[in-house]
Amino acid sequence: MKIENNILKHYLRNVYFITGTAYAGKSTTVKMLAERYDMVFCGENYHIGVSDAVAMPEIQPDLCYRRELTDWKDFVRRSPEEYERWIYNSGREGAGFEIAELISLARDRKVIADTSIPLDILKEISDYHHVAVMLSPMSMSVDRFFDRSDPDKQFLLNVIDSCDDRDAVMENYRRGLARINSKKHYDEYAESGFFTVVRKDDGRDTRDEVCDTIARHFGLIS
């Protein structure tokens, strides 16, 4: 059975999506929008509790990777090419879980989601005024990846720090981040046709400005 895109779009009409590269301010903006406009908050990996429990290796092998992992050092030691492939394919495998979760939340309230749903699927299930792309220069998305206090990033940093060849592992992991946030992927976001906000590396605190810009794009304020 397949649910047609026009049906999904109807049931997702209260959902607003933010996607983009690392360190672009997605998590902060999603949180601010949820608080300011009484929206349901769906932060990064909001669907992971269900997908970890339900994903099947023969259907969603990349979503099952972490569940079957016995040593997180293997996670951070993967080749940059494999890490890039895994990240983007996990987003594609997880799209169905995200969509189902969002439909369950969005019947009576607006929802704001930090999403990994691929751009081509977003174009099918949503529209211009319900999607915003946030981008950062690669120097920020890679070099400052661990300059955040969120538990997932700090957990990975601790895993890397625990490796005997810590510096080599960190360099390998950063090469993976560079591939994930490469010019190729940056351009895919920038040229997607969706509304786009680019973070400037000038030291200014632009959180309120960016939040207002995206809220206006979403029609939450005039």
Where are these regions (language model features)?
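P-loop (Walker A) phosphate-binding loop of NTP-binding proteins
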Residues: 21
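Conserved glycine(s) of the Walker
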Residues: 25
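NTP-dependent small-molecule kinase module
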Residues: 3, 177-222
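Pre-Walker A adenine-sensing motif
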Residues: 1-10
